[in-house]
Amino acid sequence: LLRSKGITVHVLQDSNQVMDTPDSIFPNNWFVSMEGGRLMLCPMWAPNRRHERLKFLGQLVDLIGHDKLKVSNYGPAHEAQSKFLEGTGAMILDRINMKAYACLSPRCDEDVFKKFCKEFGFKPVAFHGFQTYEGKRAAIYHTNVMMALGEAFAVVCLSAIDDLTERAALVKELQGDGKEIIDVTEDQINNFAGNEIELCNADGKRFTIMTKATYDCLTPEQRAVIEKTSEIISPDVKTIETYGGGSVRCMISEIFL
């Protein structure tokens, strides 16, 4: 589907013959690719997900090229300290304005987040997010549950940020960059409304990838904001969402050369 729109797609092939990696369908958590062949390997909360770095790194190196590759391995040292930063699940990166947005949680450690931002030149914008579960406020563990960025818009569940100072600071950063804010509800993020990604094809045309469940839960007015500047692609991945716990954004990890 993405290839039909002129988007270059590489698939990391898995096999359980070597190591059991049941969550490898979500590669955006274990690495972050930056321009110039720079690659961050991420410290992962779940021990079995740490195998993905070793198992798939060779395929990734082949894509980026040995000559260009510059690796920053954040994995083992931070995992030994129980400090985690699970890639572009934990961080939403605005690569144009060089800002990194993060909902702090056990899977997004503030110290490691700030270290990443300092090394790669991002301005850190951190906050705390919550959603109501069984009548109580529970921490949101990945930022891409509640937030997504396009070049001209930002999808975010502002009501998930209970601290009004943090909420106002986030809005100020987004509006300061000229992004139109699409404020989604907790019910909508339960349908993966924050789990979207905007991609470009070789001609520079922008596409926003979201699940059918997300498309259906957004209002026509919310979709219209996205469609001003980006064509929506909305495949049905209900089985993955139901049994894997993630959606299309988690399944896509950008490659920058």
Model-derived features: positions:
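The feature marks the mature, well-folded catalytic cores of soluble enzymes
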Residues: L1-L257
